């Protein structure tokens, strides 16, 4: 039996369960899982010192664009923080932004020919085909209850910079390994 990997994103508006795609984006999934579990080294962007423990716990969804996506994974909550390192995209030809509720890496494009993925991610609430080939898709929201939570987050009131007026907190990310 094959093992499948899931992430449960516990937010203050409800839980989002996502199936991860390690066969399509192994480095990206490994990075996300290790940050979530606190087993990967990272640098605290506030202090410049080594961080410890689960990276995502207590962060916020700092950017929400209604009809497009919800974005989180920045420990600074401002859109430019990360784990202190970057890595390249893993664009898989079988994965395209052709349906809603896909989990992908947020990035700043290529810099010096290198990828800028770190810890920030987004979940789509539309089918943004213009992102194909630019962002690594590494998971998908799996159940209707989770999709409802994504939709609710996707419609919260926002202010300047698409930041929610009231924080949407990612309280924890739990990784589950299940037999298929």
Task: Give the role of each language-model region.
Residues 1-180:
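Cyclophilin-like peptidyl-prolyl cis-trans isomerases
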């Amino acid at each position: 039996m094959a093992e499948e990997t899931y992430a449960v994103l516990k937010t203050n508006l409800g839980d989002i369960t996502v199936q991860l795609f390690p066969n399509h984006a192994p480095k990206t999934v490994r990075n996300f899982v290790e940050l979530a579990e606190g087993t990967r080294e990272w640098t605290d962007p506030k202090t410049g010192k080594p961080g410890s423990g689960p990276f995502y716990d207590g962060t916020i969804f700092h950017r929400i664009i209604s009809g497009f996506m919800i974005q989180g994974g920045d420990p600074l909550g401002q859109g430019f923080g990360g784990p202190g390192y970057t890595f390249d995209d893993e664009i898989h030809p079988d994965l395209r932004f052709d349906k809603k509720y896909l989990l992908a890496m947020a990035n700043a494009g290529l810099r010096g020919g290198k990828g800028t993925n770190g810890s920030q991610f987004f979940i789509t609430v539309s089918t943004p085909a213009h992102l194909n080939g630019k962002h690594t898709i590494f998971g998908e929201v799996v159940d209707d209850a989770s999709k409802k939570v994504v939709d609710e987050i996707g419609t919260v009131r926002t202010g300047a910079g698409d930041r929610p007026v009231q924080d949407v907190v990612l309280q924890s990310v739990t990784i589950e390994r299940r037999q298929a």
